[in-house]
Amino acid sequence: MKSKDYVQELNGLTTDKLLDREKELKEQLFNLRFQLATGQLENTASLKQVRKDIARVKTVLRQQELNK
């Protein structure tokens, strides 16, 4: 299952790297939305996947914040 492996990978990252990952994902989401608006996006499921990945990163960041 990809999500469990992805979350385990995220748990091993530092806060700075998680913030960088979040920024990259937000940029990717922006580009996907732009492609959708211009009709160039073929795989619309990628929007949902990127949004979920952003949520996973934010969840791990929040968990780390609460554990401090």
UniProtKB/Swiss-Prot annotation:
UniProt entry keywords in alphabetical sequence: Ribonucleoprotein, Ribosomal protein
GO process terms (BP): translation
Domain of life: Bacteria
UniProt xrefs under SUPFAM superfamilies: Ribosomal protein L29 (L29p) (SSF46561)
One CC-aspect GO term: cytosolic large ribosomal subunit
KW Ribosomal protein (keyword) present: yes
Organism ancestry: Bacteria, Bacillati, Bacillota, Bacilli, Lactobacillales
A single MF term (Gene Ontology): structural constituent of ribosome
Pfam families documented for this protein: Ribosomal_L29
InterPro entries: Ribosomal_protein_uL29, Ribosomal_uL29, Ribosomal_uL29_CS, Ribosomal_uL29_sf
UniProt similarity note: Belongs to the universal ribosomal protein uL29 family.
Protein name in UniProt: Large ribosomal subunit protein uL29
Keyword Ribonucleoprotein annotated: yes
